[in-house]
Amino acid sequence: MKVYACLCAAVVMLVMTSRVSEARSTGAPLSACRDMMPQHNATAQTSPPPYTITTDAQSVAPGDSVEVVIAGKLPEDTLRGYLLQARQGDDILGTFSLEDGDVFSQLINCGKPGNAVTHKKHDNKEDKRQVRVRWSPPQGLTGEVVFRATIVKTLKVFWVGVQSAPIKIVS
């Protein structure tokens, strides 16, 4: 009877643990699309982020794309997770695409398919030093956009609203 009770307790613990593990690191929830706040039960950092968001061009035309890179400033500044969008004011614009074989990132729908990109579930040993994606503006867009991100270093250490320099949309 004691063996049965121990076995039941072990199964209950396994189920509870797997649910907790399953709820983490699967990418940004859709509820984060507008305010970009992860559901980590922690407050965003107010210190300058140890990450940069850069592009391979200062302008892009509809029909073309630009590479966007999120990178740590130092080797120890790895990314455990992120949510990246192109914004003009509060509008989330354009479409992202991933490099072939990218096992870290996934496209999500923040109002339109592929207009945001986030991380996939992964082991902490697979945190990244940098992430590379491509972004294409929609037809008819003019003005400038910035790339805005939430970047997660650990579950409780993350920055919201990290921004790139603006890029110009040209026709």
From Swiss-Prot:
InterPro entries from the UniProt entry: Ferric-chelate_Red/DefProt (IPR051237), Reeler_dom (IPR002861), Reeler_sf (IPR042307)
GO cellular component terms, A-Z: extracellular region; membrane
Signal sequence coordinates: 1-23
Location(s), subcellular: Secreted
Keyword check for Signal: yes
Disulfide bonds: C33-C110
Gene Ontology terms describing biological process: defense response to bacterium; defense response to protozoan; innate immune response
Designated name of the protein: Putative defense protein
Native organism: Bombyx mori (Silk moth)
Upper lineage: Eukaryota, Metazoa, Ecdysozoa, Arthropoda, Hexapoda
